[in-house]
Amino acid sequence: MWIVFGAVFLAGLGMSWRMVGNPDLGFQLNAARYLLSHGDVPRAEPFLYTVPWSRYVDLQWLWQLSIYGANQWGGVLGMNLLCVGYTFIASAILLIRCRNWCGGIGTVSAGFLLFFFMVNFWDFRPHTISWIYLSLVLLCLERHFTGDKRAVWCLPLVMLGWVNCHALFSLGLMTIGLWTVGEVVEACLAKGEDRAKSFKKVYRLIGAGALSGLVCLINPYGWEGIMFPLRQFSLLTSAHIAKDSVFGINEFVPLWGKTLVFSQYGRFCLPLNGVLLRLLFIGVGVGFLLRRPRWPAPVWILGVAFAALYLTAVKNWSYFSFALIPYAVTGWSQRMLPWRTRAAMPTRVFILALCVLLLLLMRVDWWSRATSGLGSGLAYSPTGHSRGAAETIRRAGPEVRIMNPHDLGGWLAWATGQKVYIDGRNDNYPERLYRESVATGLAENFKALIEVIRANVVVARELGEGVWIETLAKEPNWRLVFRSDGILVFMRNDLAPEIPALGKENVAGGIPSDFVAWDRQLQLEAAKPLPGWWRALPFGQLVLDGVAGQSAGSIFLGRSEEAQAYAWAGICKNRYFIVELWVNLAAAFEMAKEYRLADFCWDTILRKVPDKDLQERAEKARARRNMADPRPYQEEMRRRGLR
């Protein structure tokens, strides 16, 4: 079995070897830098100029110092090794709990651990250290339940560390409280001497739990720090816009809140993340219910609570896993006991083969893209961590006021050393600020906001903020100064005039020269087939490069020929009919008033993919032809813009 577990951990290490896309990393590093430079944790809002009066409760300071130190020592590699190390320590404690319940660890434990590694996003986030603390809390409680009188007194030490590493220390207090309720139920159901012994255990647990709550006051914010998780809980249980299925943040959406999409514009899609997250819930839930005799009351109460947390917000999948996988392993192990001897070797071979396959899929860049949308290899994702954009902003000096998307705020503040409009700390600033940023999907709201906040720098993404791009491209007092990897930076003309504006790209020779040439070439390209379903599977993956975003960005900038060139380059080099590129080409023709060519594109698209959404786009595009001053293209076509 040691070979099997070694292969599982090796597969986990291999799956962690992916690009960094975590939007929170910037403000985590920034907070550590602030602490080291000021000698204290931040208290007033340090990173946003929009809500300077807001309080910043930063209970993650110890974890932030560790990730900052790892970054200073080894960059991305150092941070990856640190977080993988945290994950592996938590996994080792999980296996100890599996052994305690099952009398040993076998292939079922290895299978569940490998499945956890497959679902894991391998982000650099404080959840990794919270997994350790949650596992330790549960280990202490379970040993106390089985008669260990000393284990429960380790809880205060665990909680003292947890409260200074992550705001979700509240999960530890919740777990202790729920387990105590369960032990009270067990004590009430006991009889005779067992009843008296059970209540002694309850009193001991209540004492240790009370002490655990008191030591949580030993944090930089005292009582305010203990109360902070209530803000997070209200976000999860309220109608906060962050939970909205359209405008919200993916990790706050309920598990079943989003429909799995298996087809997009005639192409088969494999929503691997959504499938794995649902299978995890089902596999753990069924295993939990299979155990005989039934679980004692503390485990039942804990199971219901963590299942509810997972169903409420998908971000809680990992806590659900670390809490309940040992119980699921116990249930499945009991059910598979009659086949244990016959199935042991085939199961081990299957797990080993799956580990090898996962490493191979990482090697060919499929698994990381299918699960996180990012390539493999330890490097920053350029779309979420643009060094070029940060360097351009730094050149503008200290007078910048940055208007930015929600996901880019943390990195921009860290990389530029400047305050930003908004970042990903949704539980630390008012919901109004996030609603305000969402409302900038309408041009009039965006124009009004940049005047109110006096922004002189705007950072936008080609595939996220098309309305911003199109609005600023038409404003005479703004100029485009940076464009790369899907990120655009605009500056007011009176800011850093030494930074030149970017002009149009020279596309001469990149597109057909006249209508006849266009017509002939379009006929040939339109004959290409749609990608088959197997193109979404390993070794047949269809990976669209940045040309779709580049052509969309040029549309928003009002550069028709440039947009045509980008879209046409993508169409010509691809073996298949890619709808997004044809939509962008049609939009570029609309902009140039080449309506016959635009109609050919729309008709071809709808003939190949009779989709209602595409039909609506075509109708809106044709209706715009007679408008004297149409609204921004992205605003007219779709909230989320072109791809």
Language-model features, listed with the residues they occupy:
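Membrane-interface alpha helices of multi-pass inner-membrane proteins
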Residues: 12, 114-118, 139-140, 152-167, ...
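C-terminal luminal/periplasmic domains and tails of membrane-associated envelope-modifying transferases
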Residues: 367-407, 414-643
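Membrane-interface transmembrane helices that cradle and orient dolichyl/undecaprenyl
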Residues: 137-152, 183, 284-292
